[in-house]
Amino acid sequence: MYKRQSTKTAYYHLPGLFEFYDLYSVFLPLFYSHREYFYDWCDIASVYGAPADCIWGGGRVESGNRDPRKVLALLREYGISARLTFSNSQLEPVHLADKKCNALCALFSENDRVQNGVIIHSDLLLDYLKSHYPNLYFVSSTTKVLTDFADFLNEVKNDDFLYVVPDFRLNKAFDRLNTCLLYTSPSPRDRSVS
């Protein structure tokens, strides 16, 4: 039997929620049934992405058209959080009625073991999702390009966000980023779902 050796875990957030479904349907069973093949200090916290043609998307070009129910079932099987990438910064109120995006949020908010989330750029969309899909958690998108450290710190202190993804230009500001670690939360898989 495999025994974990390390006490600290690095949680990875993987891309291609819909786009790489075929890969994950092979990789995840291997990862969890043969942990001895992988470092014991790493685990998967979430897989993120959006299907093609989602108006709320926009931060990344996606090409996956997998059935959202199958995608969600695969991640649920392994206790991994799914994150919809809805980082369109140009949304207007008329876009909030989009049937495809609302159906995805309704499906992903039906959590049984692990809470799912949305990576988000637009404050308009954030307010809408908070009121319509309160079971989802929110991640502030790197597409906001918060390069001023004070702006980044304000975002970290915003209670609406479970996570804030810094702009890559702040990645090496270790002395200042360590201060922000005081505000971080555990992996969504470690949060209880009520």
List PLM regions with ranges:
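A short acidic, amphipathic alpha-helical/loop segment
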Residues: S25-L30, Y128-H132, D151-E155, D175-T179
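Single conserved hydrophobic/aromatic residue that forms the stacking wall/gate
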Residues: M1-K3, Y183-V193
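Glycine-enriched alpha-helix->loop->beta-strand junction motifs that scaffold or abut catalytic
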Residues: V114, H132-F138, V156-V164, L181-L182
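Short amphipathic alpha-helices and their capping/turn segments at secondary-structure boundaries
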Residues: Y24-Y39, N65-R76, L177-L182
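Alpha-helix termination/capping residues and helix-transition junctions
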Residues: F38-W41, E110-D112, K157-N158
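Active-site beta->alpha loop and helix N-cap motifs at the rims of alpha/beta catalytic domains
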Residues: G16-L23, A45-H132, Y137-T147
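Glycine-rich phosphate/ribose-binding loops and adjacent secondary-structure elements
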Residues: S141-R176, S185
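N-terminal basic/disordered segments at the start of proteins
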Residues: R4-C42
